[in-house]
């Protein structure tokens, strides 16, 4: 059977097209259709969105795996957070990553936008720890 196989442990979380699933036992599942999903450490809770980069990631997470009703508002939020961060930062690296992230989000490439947002978080962490 074709598809993407995922192995999850008891307590792991998976979000598929807006549905949050928590596994009570170890499981192996196969996603046979094209779906938007995140699992494990890819999922950020609202209490973790404590910095500008993390707020961008959290909004993009909803763009990627939220319900249809949530996605439009989340994209507006993500673009707002990206624009605010870009206006405030002096880092050319951050501005470049922010521009790429916004373009990916606006063109429907949610997972790519999340990967770029993780790079922005790492950059932000490195700058703030100096």
Regions found by a protein language model. Name each.
Residues 1-130:
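Terminal leader/tail segments of proteins
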């Amino acid at each position: 059977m074709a598809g993407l196989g995922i192995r999850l442990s008891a307590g792991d979380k998976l979000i598929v097209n807006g549905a949050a699933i928590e596994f009570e036992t170890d499981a192996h599942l196969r996603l046979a259709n094209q779906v938007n999903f995140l699992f494990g450490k890819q999922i950020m809770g609202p209490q973790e969105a404590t910095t500008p980069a993390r707020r961008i990631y959290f909004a993009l997470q909803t763009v990627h795996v939220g319900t249809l009703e949530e996605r439009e508002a989340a994209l507006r939020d993500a673009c707002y957070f990206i624009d605010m961060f870009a206006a405030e930062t002096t880092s050319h690296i951050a501005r470049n990553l922010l521009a790429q992230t916004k373009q990916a989000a606006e063109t429907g490439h949610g997972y790519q936008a999340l990967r770029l947002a993780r790079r922005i978080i790492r950059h932000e962490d490195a700058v703030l720890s100096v």
